[in-house]
Amino acid sequence: MPTGVPILEYHMVDEVDPEEGWTYNVPPEDFRQQLDYLQQQGYTTITPLEFMKAKKGKLDLPEKPIILSFDDGYENNYTTMLPILEAHNMKAVVYMATNSIGRPNYLTWDELREMQDRGVEIGSHTANHQPLTHLDHEKQLEEIKLSKLLMEWNGIRTVFSFSYPNGEVSPEMPEMLKENEYLTAVTGDAGLNTFDTNPYLLQRTNIPHPRFGLMEFKLRLLKAAVMTKLGIHQH
C-alpha cells in the first residue's frame, strides 16, 4: 500500500468571521484551494470503509489515497461543503453527534440520508458529544450504541465509522467499538495511517481556520508525514 494515508479533520465550511471564535471553520474559497492542491498533488479521496475493505484485500487503494473527515455534522457540510466536494469529484465522511440532528445549524435526517446517497459516508460522533473518557463504562456504551442504532433506525445505511469527541481515547475504547460492530475510529493525533495502524486509533491532521492561507495547509500535511516518519504518536 502507499507509505501512509492522511486523514484530514474538518468541522465547518462557511463564510464566518474567525474573530467571532469560529476557529474550526474553513471559508469556502480556502476549502476550494485546498481541494485543488490535493488534486494537483495526485491525491484521490477514499472513505474509512473503503480503507478497511482495502485492508481486507477486497479493494485496491489508489496511488495516493486521502480521507476528508468532518466532525459534528454542521448544516454547512450539506449547503456549502458538499457542492465544492462534488465539483472536485471527491468523497468524504461526516461524523454526526446524533442529538444535534435537526437542531439549528446542524444537519437534518433528510440531509444526512441525501448526503449518504451522494457518496458521503456517515459515521458516529456519539449521541451527546461528551468526551468518553469522562464517562463510566455504562454511559460510554450508551453513547456508542445509541448513536449507531438511532441513525440506522432513521434510514442511514450501516454506520461503521466513529470519531472520538475531542479526540479523547481510553484504553478500553477500541475493544468496545469492535464489540459494537464499528470497523474504524479516528483520534486527534497527527500522523499517517497504514494497514498496521490500529483501525480504532486512526490518526488525523486537524485543519482549522487557515490564518496563513494555503501554505499552512501544506505544512500541516507535511507535519503528519514527518511525525509518522519519526514515530511521534500517542498511539
Question: What residue spans do the PLM features occupy?
Answer:
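Short, glycine/acidic-enriched loop or turn micro-motifs at the edges of active sites
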Residues: 74-75, 128
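Alpha-helical scaffolding within the catalytic cores
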Residues: 51-54, 77-82, 101-118, 146, ...
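Acidic (Asp/Glu)-rich catalytic clusters
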Residues: 82-90, 107-124, 178, 196
